[in-house]
């Protein structure tokens, strides 16, 4: 190793200090060169040149340095070169301004003198000196068969201002690092670890905003990038300056053979590949994020961006308390509560609360499925759906509930689930004030008030509010039972019934009725059943005061007052109050009786009728009167019997006002007023 003697611009000689023969001792000494405490610049007596802070290694010493030592050496040299070059530019700029001022003061009228040929001499650009020295100490010229990946970019007359000259230096050193970093390391290294140990290199690799009209070339995994050695220097420089070849300027950084070895390395290279330095970058985007290095044109935009790193959400919804980092996101969210839908689809007229939802909806008309699963080939309209679907292949459930430790595949499902514990119901119906924990349930509920029933059955013409209800209804025509119990082989029409049935096999605790001994898997089902014995009827009709054991029966009863018959038979046009009455009626047209009694061979159109009929053979009477203990095989018979004890007579004659406990008795009584005699003796 040797120390060179150099001469500064002022003529004073400065010799680099004598260093140890150990290679890394020289690097450590170079990193400890004294600097100014205020500016961080190198402090020396007199004028300092670039070579004054340069340590040279011989070929033998260079080979002794490992990868980390070479990168550390390069990092220290880059920092020193940047500081020295800045001093040179500042010194030359001040000297030139001083010379111009003196010449103007000495003569009243400036005289223009044409220089003779060869008289005009261009000063060597400081970056040329920097590049020459750096190429020398890194032994780039000694590599066999390698052309230096540098061009003479600084041969123009030195008429640049100070800030423009700094930009030239930035571009030259940046180009040098791109071309030689692999030769310095000798082996592949991980991009994400550069910033931890080599800050000067890291500053050159920080992401830059690319000007409009330029796009970075996308790097695909497994593809190698090699420079063509046959190309000339000028062609090579032109290609390297174009945006299409900008990412090729890091040959072998992530792989010794030119290919990527890992996804993380590919992402790091794609993220931190530097773009050429431009003066208008910092002028048009002067505000930089210190966390990720992104630049912004306005300070307010930077503040909004920084909330992603800090997690700050200053905009809070007054209805449900949900917080957002941007006011625009809050405005979109408030439309959930207000029901405002300003974005309308031109195809079908459907409206949406935000523009992104409209764009996703429009794909249903265009048939576009742009996102494909690489594992199974399934297509999706939304990238969120693809990400959620891909977790079915990995069984990944990263979102865990802190209350019950249940895991979910995506965060939205976890948020909805947590409302089970908190009882939160942020979605309110404007018509009736009812609240819901999910927006989908509110949409379904709102159709009750609007009367919208968009899903129509092709067999009978019956319409439904939900598609799932239509699919369940269609099984009444086909008698399809797609849900099978793996334990006993029993089939069910609905998945809900299968889940209820499975508890028979899995549940060890049953809820037994003390009156009749019947067992149930759920306590709520037992409570509903006990109303049969106790006669409790908590649901009361506001019109007539009649009470019912179940809410569903109250709804069906209320149709007797309103006269509503929403279920129409497509064959004969007859209307019915209940869907099951329509289903039974339709079997008259089809004459289908799929349920057979094993005892007598009698056929029935409904399974429930078969169960009731089988009690004739078994003698089973599961329904008992709480007053007298009399038993019945059907609930309707028990209800009619109770009226003997209560004295209830709900069926009144319109002609004479007489009341009856059974509708059949009222029908026979009305024959007295009409004089009708429908029963004729066949003999």
UniProtKB/Swiss-Prot annotation:
Basic and acidic residues: compositionally biased ranges: 225-239
CDD domains in UniProt: KRAB_A-box
Residue ranges of the region described as Disordered: 102-124, 209-247
Record localization: Nucleus
Gene3D superfamilies registered for this protein in UniProt: 6.10.140.140, Classic Zinc Finger (3.30.160.60)
Residue spans, zinc finger C2H2-type: 287-309, 315-337, 343-365, 371-393, 399-421, 427-449, 455-477, 483-505, 511-533, 539-561, 567-589, 595-617, 623-645, 651-673
Domain of life: Eukaryota
GO-annotated molecular function: DNA-binding transcription factor activity, RNA polymerase II-specific; DNA-binding transcription repressor activity; RNA polymerase II cis-regulatory region sequence-specific DNA binding; zinc ion binding
Keywords: Metal-binding, Nucleus, Repeat, Zinc, Zinc-finger
Gene Ontology biological-process entries: cardiac muscle hypertrophy; microautophagy; negative regulation of cell growth involved in cardiac muscle cell development; regulation of DNA-templated transcription; regulation of proteasomal ubiquitin-dependent protein catabolic process
Biased composition range(s): Polar residues: 102-120
Repeat recorded as keyword: yes
PROSITE patterns noted in UniProt: KRAB (PS50805), ZINC_FINGER_C2H2_1 (PS00028), ZINC_FINGER_C2H2_2 (PS50157)
Keyword Metal-binding recorded: yes
A GO CC term attached to the entry: nucleus
Signal peptide location: none
Residues covered by the KRAB domain: 48-123
Pfam hit, one: zf-C2H2
Function field: Transcriptional repressor. May play a role as regulator of the ubiquitin-proteasome system and autophagy-lysosomal pathway.
UniProt similarity note: Belongs to the krueppel C2H2-type zinc-finger protein family.
This protein's name: Zinc finger protein 418
Organism: Rattus norvegicus
Lineage per the UniProt record: Eukaryota, Metazoa, Chordata, Craniata, Vertebrata
């Amino acid at each position: 190793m040797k120390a060179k003697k150099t001469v500064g611009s002022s003529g004073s000689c400065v010799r680099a200090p004598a260093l140890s023969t150990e290679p890394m001792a020289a690097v450590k000494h170079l990193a400890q060169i004294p600097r100014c405490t205020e500016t961080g610049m190198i402090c020396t007596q007199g004028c300092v040149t670039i070579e004054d802070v340069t340590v040279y290694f011989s070929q033998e010493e260079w080979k002794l340095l490992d990868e980390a030592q070479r990168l550390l050496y390069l990092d220290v040299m880059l920092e020193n070169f940047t500081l020295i070059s800045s001093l040179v530019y500042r010194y030359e700029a001040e000297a030139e301004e001083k010379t111009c001022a003196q010449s103007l003061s000495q003569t009243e009228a400036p005289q223009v003198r044409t220089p003779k040929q060869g008289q005009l001499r261009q000063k060597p650009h400081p970056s040329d000196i920097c590049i020459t020295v750096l190429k020398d100490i890194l032994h780039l010229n000694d590599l066999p068969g390698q052309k230096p990946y540098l061009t003479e970019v600084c041969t123009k007359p030195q008429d640049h201002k100070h800030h423009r000259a700094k930009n030239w230096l930035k571009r030259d050193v940046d180009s040098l690092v791109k071309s030689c970093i692999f030769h310095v390391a000798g082996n592949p290294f991980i991009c994400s670890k550069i910033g931890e140990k080599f800050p000067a290199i890291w500053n050159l690799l920080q992401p830059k905003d690319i000007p409009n009209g330029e796009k970075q070339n996308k790097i695909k995994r497994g593809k190698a990038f090699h420079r063509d050695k046959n190309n000339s220097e000028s062609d090579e420089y032109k290609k390297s300056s174009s945006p299409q070849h900008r990412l090729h300027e890091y040959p072998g950084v992530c792989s010794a053979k030119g290919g990527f070895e890992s996804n993380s390395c590919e992402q790091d290279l794609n993220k931190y590949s530097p773009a050429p330095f431009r003066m208008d970058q910092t002028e048009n985007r002067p505000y930089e994020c210190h966390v990720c290095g992104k630049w912004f044109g306005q300070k307010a935009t930077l503040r909004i961006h920084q909330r992603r790193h800090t997690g700050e959400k200053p905009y809070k919804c007054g209805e449900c308390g949900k917080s957002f980092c941007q006011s625009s996101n809050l405005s979109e969210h408030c439309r959930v509560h207000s029901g405002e839908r300003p974005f309308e689809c031109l195809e079908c007229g459907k409206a949406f609360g935000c523009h992104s939802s409209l764009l996703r909806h429009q794909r249903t008309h265009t048939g576009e499925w742009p996102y494909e699963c690489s594992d199974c080939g399934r297509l999706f309209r939304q990238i969120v759906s693809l990400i959620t679907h891909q977790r079915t292949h990995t069984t990944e459930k990263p979102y865990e509930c802190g209350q019950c430790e249940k895991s979910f595949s995506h965060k939205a499902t976890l948020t909805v689930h947590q409302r089970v514990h908190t009882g939160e119901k942020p979605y309110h119906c404007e018509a009736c004030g009812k609240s819901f924990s999910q927006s989908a349930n509110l949409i379904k509920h709102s159709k009750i008030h609007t009367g919208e029933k968009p899903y129509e059955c092709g067999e009978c013409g019956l319409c439904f509010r939900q598609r799932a209800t239509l699919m369940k209804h269609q099984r009444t025509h086909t008698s399809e039972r797609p849900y099978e119990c793996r334990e006993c082989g029993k089939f069910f029409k609905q998945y809900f019934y299968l889940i209820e049935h499975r508890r028979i096999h899995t549940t060890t605790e049953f809820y037994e009725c003390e009156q009749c001994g019947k067992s149930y898997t759920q306590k709520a089902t037992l409570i509903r059943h006990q109303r049969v014995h106790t006669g409790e009827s908590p649901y009361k009709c506001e019109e007539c005061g009649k009470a019912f054991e179940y809410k569903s029966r109250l709804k069906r009863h209320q149709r007797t007052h309103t006269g509503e018959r929403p279920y129409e038979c497509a064959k004969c046009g007859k209307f019915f109050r209940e869907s099951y009455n329509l289903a039974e009626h339709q079997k008259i047209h089809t004459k289908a009786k799929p349920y057979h009694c094993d005892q007598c061979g009698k056929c029935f159109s409904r399974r429930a009728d078969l169960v009731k009929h089988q009690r004739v053979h078994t003698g089973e009477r599961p329904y008992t009167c709480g007053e007298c203990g009399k038993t019945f095989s059907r609930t309707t018979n028990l209800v009619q019997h109770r009226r003997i004890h209560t004295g209830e007579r709900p069926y009144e004659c319109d002609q004479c006002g007489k009341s009856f406990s059974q509708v059949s008795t009222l029908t026979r009584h009305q024959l007295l007023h009409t004089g009708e005699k429908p029963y004729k003796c066949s003999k």
